[in-house]
Amino acid sequence: MVGRKIIHVDMDAFYASVEQRDRPHLKGVPVIVGGPPHARGVVATCSYEARKYGIHSAMPSRRAFQLCPRAVFVRPRFEVYRAVSAQIMELFLEVTPLVEPLSLDEAYLDVTENNLQMTSATHIAQYILAEIKRRTGLTASAGVSNSKLVAKIASGHQKPNGLTVLPPDAVLPFLSGLKIGDLHGVGKVTEQTLQKHGFNTVADIQQSPIAELRGLLGRDRGTELYTMAHGEDERMVRPHRERKSIGSESTFEEDTEDIDTIFETLKREALSVVKTLNQKELVCRTVTIKWKTEDFQSRSKRYTFLEETADEDTLLRVTTKLFNEIEFSGPIRLIGMSVSHLEAPPLSKQLTWQDIDSYL
């Protein structure tokens, strides 16, 4: 692990920055990308100008408007964001084949060996940030270290347009100054549990015996937190081909008009899809239900989230919502559900049903 050179690159307020780039009059203005406040929408992301007001992703748009009435709300243009993301990923692959995208706007790169024939990961990161700016007009931040865990934490340390480099001997001192909640994957419940027992910083964890953490959090979670606090992360950068969709469908033995039978079949197929989605460690952004009529005509309905999710309750409730909107005009011979726009999950919060009440 010591000899590895890992870079984590994270675009700065990606969606909002694209909108400010394409609409110069929005530069310097609080920009919120997401649903409008009057329609019970949700904030997908926002510019740094808006973040100064306490606005953040997954916040109800109505609340964001209350915090900053002069903010400009912009509908997401995912086709544009995907095109810009493709430019950025192309750059990464010019540097190294070992690229692991986490979402449209961030990725890990293993540059231990690289196409630039450069030995300094710092210089490679500087090159990448400069090229992103030149090719897209956008800024990004990067973290450089010997593990994915530390590189990702480092990339957020000096945002926006920042670069933080943590060689092996700097990892423990850097981590020791962080709050426990700064460790990725540590939620409020875990943080509060530890705080009740006198753990407030990563340094507190570093100085405690692993047995104490296991006693508080359980063997697996306690061990995980202990290793994270010491910057230990053996995970490899895993390039993957994007799978376009995951689906499951069922053909009835006889065409049916029984709504309960059709729905229970759809629910079973949906559960199968969600199980596969989680087994593959992916998140999705679009849910589609498909049905086929007795005359073999295919029909479909779909819903696209503002952000990716793999939350079972969210996906099942959207599937149910779509099903309830269908007006069947005759017997059905096939029903199925699929998810698409698949990506590796970001470590940030996934949307849940409460976040997408704009669809109710």
From Swiss-Prot:
EC number: 2.7.7.7
Site positions (Substrate discrimination): Y15
Main location per the UniProt record: cytoplasm
GO biological process, one term: error-prone translesion synthesis
GO molecular function: damaged DNA binding; DNA-directed DNA polymerase activity; magnesium ion binding
Chain residues that bind Mg(2+): D10, D105
Entry cofactors: Mg(2+)
Catalytic residues, chain numbering: E106
PROSITE patterns in the record: UMUC (PS50173)
Pfam families reported in the protein's UniProt record: IMS, IMS_C, IMS_HHH_1
Localization per record: Cytoplasm
Swiss-Prot/TrEMBL catalytic activity: DNA(n) + a 2'-deoxyribonucleoside 5'-triphosphate = DNA(n+1) + diphosphate
GO cellular component terms listed in the entry, alphabetical order: cytosol
Domain annotation UmuC: ranges: 6-187
Coiled coil start-end: none
Swiss-Prot/TrEMBL keywords: Cytoplasm, DNA damage, DNA repair, DNA replication, DNA-binding, DNA-directed DNA polymerase, Magnesium, Metal-binding, Mutator protein, Nucleotidyltransferase, Transferase
Note describing how the cofactor binds: Binds 2 magnesium ions per subunit.
Role noted for this protein: Poorly processive, error-prone DNA polymerase involved in untargeted mutagenesis. Copies undamaged DNA at stalled replication forks, which arise in vivo from mismatched or misaligned primer ends. These misaligned primers can be extended by PolIV. Exhibits no 3'-5' exonuclease (proofreading) activity. May be involved in translesional synthesis, in conjunction with the beta clamp from PolIII.
Family: Belongs to the DNA polymerase type-Y family.
Assembly with partners or alone: Monomer.
This protein's name: DNA polymerase IV
Organism: Exiguobacterium sibiricum (strain DSM 17290 / CCUG 55495 / CIP 109462 / JCM 13490 / 255-15)
